[in-house]
């Protein structure tokens, strides 16, 4: 059997790994448009419930990625000068690039054919394959080529957000609510790299607001640096 996978992100790579573990004789090719070390975003988060499923499905890969985890059990909400803490949730964060590197290594060791900097226009690029998997993201060309079958829909939400990174440590999944003369801003922040998982602490810091607030703050015409400075002053 031959399988072609469009998209070398975590989903495509992990599917390839699970299929290879299930049947090593299957020939699997993963095709990715970007380079192996290209990534978008900072960190990824998994709940303990999801990680339990990963551990049961593939203990070896679970052990490989778990060395990179930053774990926390609490959720902190900061609002009106107070901190509200809720415990017992269980999450782990890690660098998205770190996750890709681990999965690429495992897939390569299992004999998956990984091809980078290669475009996929549609299922026809995998003409000899018995199964084609579309793991090519929100704007999937594979899914679009069978739009009448999959009937995809996009529900675009109105809020505006900026995805920032910081070297500040967060011991909990952290939410801030901060209001000024322009309106209400909210943040969710989490640590994805720490002393155990990397040379320095790194965290994701996402700021969100309504479009009306975004415009009143003048952020609709702000540069990246001006946006960062505004958020830095606010939080």
Predicted regions and their residues:
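Beta1/beta-strand and adjacent pyrophosphate-binding region of the FAD-binding site
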Residues: 1-11
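A structural signal for isolated positions on well-ordered beta-strands in alpha/beta enzyme cores
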Residues: 4, 27-29, 113
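Conserved Rossmann-like nucleotide-cofactor binding loop
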Residues: 11, 15, 36, 139
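Glycine-rich FAD pyrophosphate-binding loop
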Residues: 18-41
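A short acidic, helix-capping loop that chelates divalent metal ions and anchors anionic groups
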Residues: 37-40, 85-86, 214-216
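Short, solvent-exposed loop/turn segments at secondary-structure boundaries
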Residues: 40-43, 90, 217-220
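Conserved N-terminal helical subregion
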Residues: 48-165
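Conserved FAD-binding catalytic core of PHBH/FMO-like flavoproteins
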Residues: 105, 128-131, 135-235
């Amino acid at each position: 059997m031959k399988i072609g996978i469009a998209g070398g992100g975590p989903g495509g790579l992990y599917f390839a790994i699970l299929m290879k573990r299930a049947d090593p004789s299957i020939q699997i090719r993963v095709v990715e448009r970007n380079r192996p070390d290209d990534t978008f975003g900072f960190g990824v988060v998994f709940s303990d419930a999801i990680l339990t499923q990963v551990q049961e499905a593939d203990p070896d890969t679970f052990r490989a990625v778990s060395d990179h985890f930053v774990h926390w059990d609490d959720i902190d909400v900061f609002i009106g000068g107070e901190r509200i803490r809720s415990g017992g949730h269980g999450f782990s964060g890690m660098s998205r690039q770190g996750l890709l590197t681990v999965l690429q290594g495992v897939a390569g060791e299992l004999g998956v054919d990984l091809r980078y900097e290669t475009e996929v226009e549609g299922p026809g690029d995998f003409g000899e394959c018995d199964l084609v998997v579309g793991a090519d993201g929100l704007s999937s060309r594979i899914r679009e080529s069978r739009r009448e079958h999959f009937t995809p829909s996009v529900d675009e939400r109105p809020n505006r957000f900026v995805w920032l990174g910081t070297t500040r440590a967060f011991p909990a999944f952290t939410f801030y609510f901060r209001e000024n003369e322009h309106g209400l801003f909210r943040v969710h922040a989490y640590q994805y790299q720490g002393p155990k998982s990397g040379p320095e602490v790194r965290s994701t810091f996402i700021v969100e607001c309504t479009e009306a607030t975004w415009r009143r703050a003048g952020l609709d015409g702000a540069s990246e640096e001006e946006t960062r400075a505004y958020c830095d002053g606010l939080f």
